[in-house]
Amino acid sequence: MSEVTTAEFNEEGKYLRKIRSFVLREGRLTKGQAQAIETQWPTMGLDYSPAPLDLADVFGRKADTVLEIGFGMGASLVQMAQEAPELNFIGIEVHKPGVGSCLSDAAAAGVTNLRVYHHDAMEVLEHAIADGSLTRVQLFFPDPWHKKRHHKRRIVQAEFAELIRRKLKIGGVFHMATDWENYSEHMLEVMNVASGYKNQSADGTVVPRPDHRPLTKFEARGHRLGHGVWDLMFERIA
């Protein structure tokens, strides 16, 4: 965990690489988070290497694998892993306190089917995840880049959709969620023209929140205030 990369996007939506040496100033760790990283990383942490993971070796079994991009503090990811022990889960997060919090929660919950990267998701997907190996890819509440001039910096772009499609098995699902309606519309525009996908919504728009995605405290509060959340699920069909 000595170096972390972050992805940036230019105005055409192309990925740029910005490598920086990791320093603790980039995120203050609580004692609990630091201790969790120290004690749990050897068993749950995945050190980035530009070679495809052997998932059966990593998890000690063969099982369908779910990958989440940007899990934040990790509470929902840990809950999903706890509620679906038959699945393998991989989480990717560049924010170190989030990694520490996730590992702490996972250890407290006794979760054994979760592995975590502290690295840029684009590099992990491009180099460390084999094509056709994932059952589901999750992208929940990504940065909306709400200013119009920044929309092309949003992670959901045609190139990204194709990358996710390659990593999914046939029949695998790309599940997105956002609390910005404009971003949900952007996601639909991108995904509806992306080759090899089928929208799982009956009317070609969004889907109700599926049972596998936990309702977060933030989201529940938003519902009470009349705020919306939009879920999109696209199946790989080719």
UniProtKB/Swiss-Prot annotation:
It holds the Pfam family Methyltransf_4. Disulfide bonds: none annotated. SUPFAM superfamilies: S-adenosyl-L-methionine-dependent methyltransferases. Substrate binds at K147, D179, T216, K217, F218, E219. InterPro entries: SAM-dependent_MTases_sf, tRNA_(Gua-N-7)_MeTrfase_Trmb, tRNA_methyltr_TrmB_bact. GO terms for cellular component: tRNA methyltransferase complex. Keywords: Methyltransferase, S-adenosyl-L-methionine, Transferase, tRNA processing. One of its GO terms (molecular function) is tRNA (guanine(46)-N7)-methyltransferase activity. S-adenosyl-L-methionine binds at E68, E93, D120, D143. Catalyzes the formation of N(7)-methylguanine at position 46 (m7G46) in tRNA. Belongs to the class I-like SAM-binding methyltransferase superfamily. TrmB family. This is tRNA (guanine-N(7)-)-methyltransferase.
